[in-house]
Amino acid sequence: MKIALAQLNYHVGNFESNTAHIIQNIKKAKQNGADLVVFAELCVCGYPARDFLEFSEFINQCELAAQQIAAECMDIACIIGLPIPNHKPEGKDLNNSAYFIEKGKVKAVVNKALLPNYDIFDEYRYFEPSTEFSCIDFKGKRIALTICEDLWNTIENPLYITRPMDTLIKQNPDVMINIAASPFSYNHDEERIAILKDNAARYNLPLFYINHVGAQTELIFDGGSLVFDNAGNLIDELPYFEESLTYYTLGDKGAVSFNHPSTLKKERESDIAQIHQALLLGIRDYFHKSGFSRAILGLSGGIDSAVVCALAVEALGAENVMAVLLPSKFSSDHSLKDAEDLVNNLGCMSETIAIKNITEAIETTLHPQFKDLPFNIAEENIQSRTRAILLMAMCNKFGYILLNTSNKSEAAVGYGTLYGDMCGGISVIGDVYKTQVFELARYINRDKEIIPENSIVKPPSAELRPGQKDSDSLPEYDILDKVLAGYIEHRQSATEIIKMGYDEATVHRAIKLINLAEHKRYQTPPILRVSPKAFGMGRRMPIVGKYLQ
């Protein structure tokens, strides 16, 4: 039996595009002699559809699309994922399902049993878990078809009380196929491989795993679909961060063969290399799928905006990126030069708009209220908000999307101005710690200098007052980021972090700042997720909570 794995980029709710893309790949697979072509979880509607799933018309559109797809499957079988109504009288209204289509008709329906309800996953909000498990017979082979999390329930770390494959294995399947929607975070590919490898070896069956590729708002899907033999050996993996249609032959006794050169990686890419690829895909798809093509950002001469600008140019093209220099009376000459050098290196569009006259006019207007009170954060934030007003005016006039340039360290401790430098359409590096931003800059410069060296080595500064440095207000980033990661990503308490050797006062101050800044994060743009625990939909904290204040 010849199996084709179709690793594709879908668009949530875009039934016309998704259906056409699926049918196009069915036709390609048929031309190449495939018996079965496999698509990803909820491919028909895109993942995650979120509250679109609460509209009955949305579910009807899924079924209409499935029927269009089925009409193309007279001489080839396919597996597609879609939400369908739960016809049982009890439980949620929907099932997260897979259709096995053969000879133009739905031959079998498989419903997902294990519904993730953690971090960015919220499937139990919409779907009823299945309690029935049956294999599918096709071309003399018996297929154990599962959906994503149904294979994620490992013996070592069980998340659920059931394990669908324990039931399916009793039906003597010849092969496992798992359709998935597994988003990217650094190191997640290694976890994914380990879990699937364990399943293939435990059940002594070859395993075909197909994933989404592409970005849906903040979630980035890295592809990297996998094929294992029945001993649990990883024998092939599809490319990361790009589409692929790849063919395999399933022989007797679980043998799997293929004719293409193996794309199996000899060694895993570094976290920073993966983050770089993920952010490029995240930017590109956010713009393409939202119907925009051009980006704008404020360019300060610092490392954060430099990295975001370089990523935007690589993702969208220099002709589609506008960098705006917005110097104030506190901006240093070297920062302006660093920004100009970056623009020259990238070849993107640029404008310079001085904000000194505007901020002074605002300060003069407020003088009757401010009187002779000393300069403080109020005047600092006027500068940041003035820049935001100008950038958003450019967006409205010329049709740009504003790129937010705040990093995760700043977002964590609230080192940013609401309605100022925290505004934007998408936050590019809001899930990238400051120390990782430095690494990302070095990675971008791996072949030649794109980001000026001075932007990388000079002390970070917001330049909102004379001689200002980030370290005046925050611990050094190489210490702060480790404390932040412990609290945010590993959910460690202050006591646990202090026991690791970090200064007690620093730890308590950092955690206090994180919790005090929660209200700011509720008002930030969507953040491209690259870590296991990003701010946004996967981290839900109360604004007025007192715990750990």
Predicted ranges, named:
Residues 1-298, 309-318, 325, 350:
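Enzyme catalytic cores with a strong preference for nitrogen-chemistry domains
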Residues 204, 230, 256-301, 305-549:
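ATP/NTP-dependent adenylation/nucleotidyl-transfer catalytic domains that generate, transfer
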